[in-house]
């Protein structure tokens, strides 16, 4: 139980996963018997993390969110203000997407993110979606705020 509580990938950002899955991972049972090399899958998440870091670093300067609180912002039309706010807030959200992407990459690199094999178009594909910190695209395109709980840290 202590190893579950102090597993390094939970301490990073607190990505949620079940004890049952962790126990199967430690005991190398079920889908964890023969884990393939996770290098490429984890590097994809690292690349995503670095892209989000770049968006945060550069995007915040190009489209400053602070402009939304200036007196000049009220002079624009309502549709312009809505679109500007959404675009300007994305680099701030990328600040949070970045560590969750890095943690997901670390979990996949450890092998814990392996979810077995899925057949796609008569071809077997390894699935690395057992533990995902954030589905950023789904979070950006949801209709209801309640849906965030499905795509972030679950």
Segments from the language model and where they lie:
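Long, well-ordered, tryptophan-enriched scaffold segments
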Residues: 35-64, 79, 83-88
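Helix-loop boundary elements of multi-pass alpha-helical membrane proteins
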Residues: 22-46, 137-141, 145
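Membrane-interfacial catalytic/cofactor-binding modules of polytopic membrane enzymes
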Residues: 1-5, 71-154
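Membrane-interfacial segments
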Residues: 26-29, 59, 63, 67-71, ...
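Transmembrane-helix bundle segments that line or gate the permeation/cavity pathway
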Residues: 1-22, 27, 60-64
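Alpha-helical interaction elements in eukaryotic regulators
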Residues: 8, 15-18, 22, 39, ...
